[in-house]
Amino acid sequence: MGFPKEGETIQIHSYKHNGQIHRIWNETTILKATELCIIGANDRTMVTESDGRTWVTREPAICYFHAKQWFNVIGMLREDGIYYYCNISSPFALDDEAIKYIDYDLDVKVFPDMTYHILDEDEYADHKKAMNYPKEIDGILRYHLNTLLHWIHQRKGPFASEFIDIWYERYLHYTK
């Protein structure tokens, strides 16, 4: 499959380690797509949970997926600043249907002042045991959690001061 073109829409599918679907974002506009990274945007898109419940996102968001990093980043544009929600996950895979990744439970919420909280450590411990995460996966995830925290401190990649604003402006070009 070729990479989606800028301006095209695609779904995002997250799975759990056991292969079960976790969550589907119905529509994301592609802003950049290369072998190394995909940047997309959405606003008020429908999200379907694994149990069939649905909800709609509240604000514009820029989504950043990397082929070599075991995390993805969602920058949410709110009235009081940019908030980030970071999923510790497998690198992305892409097919005709969607951008896909495995969600490994650990999350980092980053506030506009770049302080952060690591979330769902209990859920990670439970799923690590229940789904029998291999030791190698645990090591990879811990390493990439530390890499993510380094990116936050360094304001690297999607955490760079103008990154979200620049890509949001590009997104607005496609919504006119």
From Swiss-Prot:
Catalysed reaction per UniProt?
Answer: a ribonucleoside 5'-triphosphate + H2O = a ribonucleoside 5'-diphosphate + phosphate + H(+); a ribonucleoside 5'-diphosphate + H2O = a ribonucleoside 5'-phosphate + phosphate + H(+)
Q: Keywords of this protein's UniProt record, alphabetized?
A: Hydrolase, Magnesium, Metal-binding
The residues the entry assigns to the signal sequence are: none
- Superkingdom, natural source: Bacteria
Indicate whether Magnesium appears among the record's keywords: yes
According to its UniProt record, the EC number is 3.6.1.15, 3.6.1.6
Kindly list the cofactors needed.
Mg(2+)
Gene Ontology molecular functions: magnesium ion binding; nucleoside diphosphate phosphatase activity; ribonucleoside triphosphate phosphatase activity
Indicate which residues the UniProt annotation says bind Mg(2+) 1.
Answer: 87, 103, 107
Matching entries from SUPFAM superfamilies are given as: FomD-like (SSF159234)
**What residues make up the catalytic site?**
23
Indicate yes or no for the key word RNA-binding. no
**Binding-site positions, Mg(2+) 2:** 105, 107, 120, 123
Function field: Has nucleoside phosphatase activity towards nucleoside triphosphates and nucleoside diphosphates.
Concerning HAMAP family, the annotation shows: Ntdp
**Similarity comment:** Belongs to the Ntdp family.
**Protein name per its UniProtKB record:** Nucleoside triphosphate/diphosphate phosphatase
| Naturally occurring in which organism (per UniProt) | Bacillus licheniformis (strain ATCC 14580 / DSM 13 / JCM 2505 / CCUG 7422 / NBRC 12200 / NCIMB 9375 / NCTC 10341 / NRRL NRS-1264 / Gibson 46)
Its organism's taxonomic lineage begins at: Bacteria, Bacillati, Bacillota, Bacilli, Bacillales
